[in-house]
């Protein structure tokens, strides 16, 4: 029962990498970020508003995280999300953390969301501040402590193809060693 958890900073490439890893490994992908965005839409809020709302309403994070935990317990899944690896670590075979410089991430988010660089930078900084505060308050998790990760990868100067290749090489080596069979 393979479980891969990919976490990382906003704009680091975690969703794109998780989607491609899931495709190659022929596993479903569950995105905590997508679940969070769906809930924001359901509540009629934009992402930043919903982050602020979630700060006051801890049940939001608990709903998202309980879905990730259920999927991890069931196995055979790639999970993606900012906090996901910390939540599912006991069930995960491989945990990867993606990071990049704030400027690179702001450029990526600006391009993805069709907003200015400055707006993307402000959103990233605010989301990170809110996430750090919320996760510490709800779970006593310091998201700056990356010691639970098997691989920490700086994607600042890597193409998406290089990031996926490095991630898959690491995942396949880890799974092949753990399960003594060829997964990839």
UniProtKB/Swiss-Prot annotation:
S-S bonds: none
UniProt: ATP binding residues: 8-16
Stored Pfam families: Cytidylate_kin2 (PF13189)
Reaction(s) catalysed by this chain's protein: CMP + ATP = CDP + ADP; dCMP + ATP = dCDP + ADP
First-listed, main subcellular location of the protein, grouped into a coarse class: cytoplasm
Keywords: ATP-binding, Cytoplasm, Kinase, Nucleotide-binding, Transferase
Localization terms from the record: Cytoplasm
Stored InterPro entries: Cyt_kin_arch, Cytidylate_kinase_dom, P-loop_NTPase
E.C. numbers: 2.7.4.25
GO molecular function annotations of the record: ATP binding; CMP kinase activity; dCMP kinase activity
Coiled coil: none
Assigned GO CC terms: cytoplasm
Example of a GO biological process term: pyrimidine nucleotide metabolic process
HAMAP family named in the record: Cytidyl_kinase_type2 (MF_00239)
Family that this chain belongs to: Belongs to the cytidylate kinase family. Type 2 subfamily.
Identification of the protein by name: Cytidylate kinase
Lineage: Archaea, Thermoproteota, Thermoprotei, Thermoproteales, Thermoproteaceae
């Amino acid at each position: 029962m393979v479980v891969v958890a990919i976490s990382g900073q906003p704009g680091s490439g975690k969703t794109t990498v998780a989607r491609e890893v899931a495709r190659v490994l022929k596993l479903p992908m569950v995105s905590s970020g997508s679940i969070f965005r769906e809930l924001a839409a359901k509540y009629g809020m934009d992402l930043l508003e919903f982050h602020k709302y979630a700060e006051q309403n801890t049940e939001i994070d608990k709903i998202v995280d309980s879905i990730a935990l259920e999927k991890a317990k069931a196995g055979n899944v790639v999970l993606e999300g900012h906090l996901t690896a910390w939540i599912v670590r006991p069930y995960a075979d491989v945990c990867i953390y993606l990071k990049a410089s704030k400027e690179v991430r702001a450029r990526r988010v600006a391009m993805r969301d069709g907003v200015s660089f400055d707006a993307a930078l402000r959103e990233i900084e605010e989301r990170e501040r809110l996430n750090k505060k919320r996760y510490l308050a709800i779970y006593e998790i310091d998201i700056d402590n990356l010691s639970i990760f098997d691989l920490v990868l700086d994607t600042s100067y890597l193409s998406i193809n290089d990031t996926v290749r490095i991630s898959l090489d690491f995942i396949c080596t880890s799974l092949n060693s753990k399960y003594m069979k060829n997964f990839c």
